[in-house]
UniProtKB/Swiss-Prot annotation:
WD repeats lie at residues 1-36, 76-114, 185-225, 230-269, 300-346, 355-395. It comes from Coccidioides immitis (strain RS) (Valley fever fungus). This is Autophagy-related protein 18. Residues 267-300 are annotated as: Disordered. The keyword Repeat applies. The N-terminus might form a beta-propeller domain involved in specific binding to phosphatidylinositol 3,5-bisphosphate (PIP2), leading to the association of the protein to the membrane. Signal peptide: none annotated.
Amino acid sequence: MSMNFVTFNQDYSYLAVGTSKGFRIFTTDPFGKSYETKEGNIAILEMLFSTSLVAVILSPRRLQIMNTKRQSVICELTFPTTVLAIRLNRKRLVIVLEDQIYIYDIQTMKLVYTIETSPNPNAICALAPSSDNCYLAYPLPQKAPPPSFSPPSHGPPSNTHIPPTSGEVLIFDAYKLEAVNVVEAHKSPLSFLALNSEGTLLATASDKGTIIRVFSVPAAHKLYQFRRGSMPSRIYSMSFNITSTLLCVSSATETIHIFKLGQQQGLSKTSSPSRKLESSRGSGDESAVESASSEMSSRKHNGTFMGMIRRTSQNVGNSFAATVGGYLPKGVTEMWEPERDFAWIKLPKSNGGNGGSGPVRSVVAMSSNTPQVMVVTSEGNFYVFNIDLSKGGEGTLVKQYSVLDSSDRMGSTDLDY
């Protein structure tokens, strides 16, 4: 049996694992198996909070909505191309294909909107768990230039969009079904997006993976800038804690980084700027903060709808800058230096269970009840680490389980330090 997919639910109280022989659902605190089916080769699955509703992909284009309590299929949908990702909250079901996003009303399962996107083979997309701030974030579609000649009428349709060449994010209100803003997050294409539980913060990473940025939603003000590392690395997972005071990031390295957000300044002009905006001096940002001079210059609006809603998010808004500008030291009034991690975790050495297929992939989340980081790896290991919220530093491994253990006594591998 192999593990195909793993995900936490929206409040991190459950963990769902898709395998070549069905899927399993575990509670995270305390850890234990709560549901299992041994039918189907499950490519993707997604839970709806702590309900019995689960969306699963049994074949590349076929989605089933299941009720695990009644062990019944609520509905089944078939899509024109392979389903790459599922996102759920209490209002919307979002299906991500390579060049389309389908939005459904989760109460009626009716299709309410279709979005044409740039090619998105990695399904880069985030949906806020919040019903009040039902925002969807995905790479800004980039239209293909008009062809230099008219294609033959009998030929295949030409592509309307091209792969993104920069890291801009479109924020879309999935409830009102309208675009609300564009975040100019990175110079290079995106690799991962994450929204916090309230739908008020967006974390972004580019394909370089060295710099993590956090923006307010929907205003698109840049609030935080963090350095993951100096060497490029693929970002596998990013997750805010429930209170949005910490951001956890995993990548193709063995280190998981935890960044401290502190007070959410910049969300309103009346906020008192008590958080530390400057960071310890380090080496240059992502391509020297992705070429600070060009980032800090205003971009011309193009007169289109996107141009009307576009805001230069790398350039902090005038009112926000006026509020916090006096608190920045002279050296960083023009450019924020990225802050280092507050705490970090080293994953235990691999036992080769990954089959030598490359780095061990990991999905991270933070416990709602305790100062703990939960990590699931592509080898089927579930780790729990304690972190010191006052001092930070390296986290301590306190528990370890296997999500692929055939035994029902899933707690038998518990480590107590």
